Structure formats: structure tokens, C-alpha cells
Amino acid sequence: MMSRGDNMKVLVAMDEFNGILSSYDANRFVEEAVDSQIEDADIVQVPLFNGRHELLNSVFMWKSGTQYRIDVHDAEMNEIEAQYGQTEDGLTVIQAEQFQKGTGHYLNHTSYGLGEVIQHALNKGAKTFAISVGGTDTFDGGAGMLQALGAVFYDDDGERVDMTKGLGQVKHIRRVDTSGLHPQLKDAHFQILIDFSSKMYGKQSAIMQSYKTLHLSREEAVEIDNLLWYFSEIMKHELKLSLGQIERGGAGGGMAAIFKTIFNAEIMTSHELVDQITGLENLVKQADLILFGEGINERDHVINTSSLRIAELAQQYQKVAIALCGTSEKFEQYENLGVTAMFNAFDEMPTEYPDFKLGVTLRAYTVQVVKLLNAHI
């Protein structure tokens, strides 16, 4: 067991493993291993999150506050219980992926439920929001959300178009009235978390990049993409908004572009919010050893994840940093950033695997890593 004159400061910052193991649980297994090998180690865990998962739980591991459970609607307008939180320092945290789910055709899915959650928070005085919109089952360009917040869509005959019925209704829209939007929105500040690069429509749209993993045909994806283009044209004509060129605007099926253009939202990566909430850079600066990693299996359109940010900071402050990952997909990037050593549990990250078994594997790798370091310190 390693022993030092001063307590060794160890930073443990594991991201999730493809929905199998949460950031919190991955951290716990790694911490157990460190604790078994380094006497009196001063271990700090940083629960991470990304633009799809882990946001709510991770934030409330660092901050105190109140979590609410409210009845809203899922992507298919079925009643569902949603959970969101408000921290004591005024940050409202919403993880849209928790309740914006559906099993039917994406043309019939709506983002109305997210609007309901935002409305509930606004009614409780919320002014600052952090919202992750990735991983939802909606591609309605945020139209359902806008309707829940007070916007009205009209057809040629002046009749209302009901966007709770999904993107398929977009083709009927001719006029948009936002005068009835919730009055508190004008004072609200939104931070939208996105770790994946996509536009609202076109070759780089979210739907065109992901339709195969969503089990859609290319023809179905093109139909959705064309409707999103039409919706953006309506919004340009009616509200003078340019949705198509917003960087990362395709997240949440186009919700990110709406947040940016209508509500002047700040689009940010998850690691930027991690920095903001946890003081990650200072924790890296103080650490003697950093153990980090992830099992996020997203090949084509990853912008950045917190693990890459940690590697950058470790290089900046010349720290010993060990990556414990589900796969080797980011190893070249880690290598370029000077990560000390890298280990992967799988050749390809599985979609199903016993969580405890994965945790034990991480713990075993960590024990061996620390033993190697112990032999050279």
C-alpha cells in the first residue's frame, strides 16, 4: 500500500458507461480501488454529466436545493412524471431525456412536455436554466415546447395548428404568434448543454446523422429533415429568425436552435458547465493523480466530452493522468494530450452488460494501475 508524507490528492472523475454504469457508480468503484492501495488518500470525486444523461443527479451531488416531481406529457402526449431541480443559488436543472421519450413514429412526437416543465419552473420564479436536450425522441424543431409556453400556430384558414401532434403538423403552419409567450421568459437565461455537432436540417442535421441508429430508413429521415427545413422557413418569414446555421442547433430535434434564436440561450458543452459548477480546473491543479474516463460510444459527431477537457487540464498542469475507458475510441486524442496511460475494458462498448460486473472490472484495472504507480513512486 502506498504511503506518503503528505496525503496524496487523487481526483476521480469518471463519466457514464453507455447507460450501463452511471458516473456516480463508476466513481465509487474507482475510489474503492484507490482507497485500498493508497494509505490515507485524499480522494475527491467529480460526478460528470453530458448533453444527454446524468445532469440532474450530478448537479445535486454538488449543490443543495429542491427537486420537483410534476405531471407532464412525454413525446407521445402520454401523461408522465417529470423531475427537475432548483438549486439554492438559483439554477434550474432540467434533463429533457428523462421524460421526452416515445416509441411511435418520430413524425408524431412532440416537445410539448419540455415546455410544460419550463412553464412550471417559471411559475416558481426560475430565471436561470441549465437544460440538456440530447437523447430525446423528438424532432419537431421545438414547436411543441413553444406551444406549451404560449406560442400559437395558424393554418391558411386561421385555425390553430396543434403541435402536440408532432412534426407532421408543421406542413399546415402559415403563421406564428409568439405574443402570448410566458411573460417571465424575457428575464430568463438558458444554458443548453450539447456535446454533439449537428444543424437543424441538411446533411449535418441530427436526423441525417443518426437515422440508422434510430432504425429509420433514409427516406423517413429525409421526410423529417424536409419538414424541419420548412419549419425553419416559416420561422424566418414570420419572426425573422435564421435557424439553419446555428452551430449545434439540431440538438433535441432542433430545440437548441429555437432556444438560441428566440430566447438568446447560451449553447455550451457539458464540460463547460462542469467547470462552472465544480471548479474542475482548480481540482485538477491541486491533484497529484487523476483517474478519469468514459464509456460513451458516439463515433460520428462528438464535439467534446468532459474526459477530453480533463485530459487537456492534466496536460496544462503536468499531472499524472490515467484514462479508464469502455473503448479505445478516444485514445489517440488522449495520447496527443499527453495522458500518462490508457486502459479499455472492451474492444467495442456493449449496449447491455451487468453494471456490477463492469464496476468490478473498473475496480480491478484501477488496483493494477495504482500498484504500477506505487512501484515507481
Feature annotation, model-predicted:
Residues 1-2:
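Methionine residue identity
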Residues 5-133, 137-377:
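N-terminal loops that bind phosphate or other acidic moieties
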